[in-house]
Amino acid sequence: MVSLAKRVDRDVMPVSLASGRTLPNVTPIMQAIGTSGFIVAENGGMVWDSIQGHGIRSLSDGSRARKAAEWLATKIEGLDPRGIESNRWRETEWCLSNTDSFEQMKSLIADSEWSDLEVVSTGFAVHIANPGLDKSLGLSIAMDQRGIDPKRVIACGDAPNDIPMFDLVGFSVAVSDLYPEVVASADAITEERGKSGSIELLKALLGQ
């Protein structure tokens, strides 16, 4: 997949990464791929375009999200407020590993002093963030820095946190059918799923 991404970046269009992972997690992946795009991390909360010489931009303060997680731990038995290990590097949101309790978390937050916060599950973790903080925000800033029209961008994803990104770009591709709402928001879905679906998309962009 890395070699395909490099070829797309060289011959078709710049390849960027937009992820729910932290910047320290995404950066080495981007470096390993070696493409000319930018990074959007923490579901839109962190933007870094080192290729174009732009500094790291942190778009939110995750302290309220962390306090909300600590409060949730007093309401849900067995919930660890420390969340996933990468929270140690998280600046703009807070992530909890108890995905089975997602609906309960969402309901509790909705009736609390943190009702303005967004609660989104990616299947891997439950992300708690300030309102309006999503991939479309970070991507809009990153694209604006480069003078890119979002409608000339293709994006792929597989989880609910990708929906704002799908709504922003000109063409969106779902590489999983696990979430019906993700499939419904996408312009197309790959025949293969997951990593194989991403490879299918890259090959299609290369005309293979």
Residue ranges of predicted features:
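Asp-based, Mg2+/Mn2+-dependent phosphohydrolase catalytic module
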Residues: 168, 172-208
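Active-site phosphate-binding/coordination module
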Residues: 1-87
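Conserved acidic, metal-coordinating active-site core of Asp-based
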Residues: 68-168, 177
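Short active-site oxyanion
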Residues: 11-16, 36-37, 151-152, 168-171, ...
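Phosphate- and divalent-cation-binding pockets in alpha/beta enzyme and binding domains
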Residues: 25-28, 104, 138, 164-165, ...
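Short, structured coil segments at secondary-structure junctions
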Residues: 33-35, 43, 113-115, 168-169, ...
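Short amphipathic alpha-helical segments
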Residues: 27-31, 52-53, 107, 167-168, ...
